[in-house]
């Protein structure tokens, strides 16, 4: 059992590890056993959080030219549909290089606009890099290997996830931006947000809110160094209230259009189960701007806001400005005019291109 805990709200909560970590560990173990001709029971991997995991290897299967094994997903106290699921990797020797494939129970992306290209297995960018890094660390220099990730119960479990709504078929996604699962109970998460805001407010007169790791990466990659970033998950309204309670009057919110656009409709909890109006916001603005209804329908047919942005291309800067201005207006109303707000809105997971920055923003000055 993974022995890492966080404390929140007076409760001790156990962390877990992602399907991405499981896939990377299984792939590394299978590769090691294939080329060293011996079984092992535990494998160590690193994670993007620089936390090392020592994971127990299960169900080793040796064939003529390949070896496969599994790692059991442990979600800690954040038990979701994939917790307890076996994530397998099969390693086969090839002439040279590294290849990564998706097998049984790993979903296939069928729509544009996700973080993985259409037709590819639903193995997200960070897990892909983790798998490659760990495999290459044990692959002999003069050898090549093909890794196939497969999840025997993946097709069944995927029905309990959001994959069907996203156009990901026939299995689960291999996910995780940090490699670690932190307990996400609402009470615990809100308390941790409140504590971080209070801590950051001690030495800062302004705060920057991001929804998750991607938002923070967006800032750091552009040279932002101040220690005033708070990850607020989906709790925009709650976080604003906490900041105001600490006397913070200047707030910048940095986020993907899929999150920020919801605020334009007055949604201050941006979780998809609470508010899912991303496409409607874009469609409404296009309609108000006088664009053809055929284009509006195409936007509404997309699975994600990412897909809508890619469909529209780079010819709609006024659209994002209008959405941004409505977000700012909603924020001002929510805070009763007691704070100054700025926003930075982007799209993409790798390129993370800026769509809109409010006029008074000075994060990079």
Curated annotation (Swiss-Prot):
EC numbers, comma separated: 2.1.1.195
Organism: Clostridium perfringens (strain ATCC 13124 / DSM 756 / JCM 1290 / NCIMB 6125 / NCTC 8237 / Type A)
Membrane-crossing segments per the record: none
Class in the EC hierarchy, top level: transferase
Gene3D superfamilies in UniProt: CbiD-like (3.30.2110.10)
UniProt cross-references to PANTHER family, sorted A to Z: COBALT-PRECORRIN-5B C(1)-METHYLTRANSFERASE
Protein name: Cobalt-precorrin-5B C(1)-methyltransferase
Alphabetized Pfam families for the sequence: CbiD (PF01888)
InterPro entries found in the cross-reference section: CbiD, CbiD_sf
Keywords carried by this UniProt record: Cobalamin biosynthesis, Methyltransferase, S-adenosyl-L-methionine, Transferase
Catalysis: reaction(s): Co-precorrin-5B + S-adenosyl-L-methionine = Co-precorrin-6A + S-adenosyl-L-homocysteine
GO biological process: anaerobic cobalamin biosynthetic process; methylation
Keyword S-adenosyl-L-methionine: yes
HAMAP family: CbiD
Pathway annotation: Cofactor biosynthesis; adenosylcobalamin biosynthesis; cob(II)yrinate a,c-diamide from sirohydrochlorin (anaerobic route): step 6/10
Similarity remark: Belongs to the CbiD family.
Gene Ontology MF terms: cobalt-precorrin-5B C1-methyltransferase activity
């Amino acid at each position: 059992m993974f022995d890492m805990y966080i404390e929140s709200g007076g409760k001790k909560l156990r962390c877990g590890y992602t399907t991405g970590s499981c896939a990377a560990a299984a792939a590394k173990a299978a590769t090691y056993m294939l080329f060293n001709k011996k079984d092992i029971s535990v494998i160590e991997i690193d994670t993007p959080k620089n936390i090392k995991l020592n994971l127990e290897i299960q169900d080793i299967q040796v064939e003529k030219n390949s070896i496969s094994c599994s790692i059991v997903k442990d979600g800690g106290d954040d038990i979701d549909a994939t917790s307890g699921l076996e994530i397998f990797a099969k390693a086969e020797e090839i002439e040279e290089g590294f290849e990564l494939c998706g097998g049984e129970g790993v979903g296939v992306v069928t729509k544009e606009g996700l973080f993985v290209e259409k037709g590819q297995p639903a193995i997200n960018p960070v897990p892909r890099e983790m798998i490659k890094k760990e495999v290459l660390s044990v692959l002999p220099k003069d050898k090549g290997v093909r890794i196939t990730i497969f999840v025997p119960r993946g097709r069944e479990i995927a029905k309990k996830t959001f994959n069907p709504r996203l156009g990901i078929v026939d299995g689960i996604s291999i996910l995780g931006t940090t490699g670690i699962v932190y307990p996400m109970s609402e009470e615990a998460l809100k308390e941790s947000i409140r504590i971080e805001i209070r801590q950051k407010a001690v030495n800062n007169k302004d705060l920057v809110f991001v929804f998750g790791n991607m938002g923070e990466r967006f800032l750091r990659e552009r040279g932002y160094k101040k220690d005033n970033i708070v990850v607020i998950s989906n709790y925009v309204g709650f976080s604003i209230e906490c900041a105001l309670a600490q006397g913070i009057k200047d707030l910048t919110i940095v986020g993907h259009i899929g999150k920020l656009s919801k605020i334009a409709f007055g949604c201050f909890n941006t979780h998809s189960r609470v508010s899912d109006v991303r496409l409607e916001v874009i469609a409404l603005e296009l309609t108000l701007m006088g664009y053809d209804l055929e284009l509006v329908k195409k936007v509404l047919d997309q699975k994600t806001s990412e897909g809508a942005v890619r469909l529209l291309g780079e010819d709609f800067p006024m659209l994002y400005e209008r959405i941004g201005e409505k977000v700012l207006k909603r924020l001002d109303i929510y805070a009763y005019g007691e704070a100054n707000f700025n926003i930075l809105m982007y799209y993409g997971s790798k390129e993370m291109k800026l769509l809109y920055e409010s006029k008074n923003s000075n994060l990079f000055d």
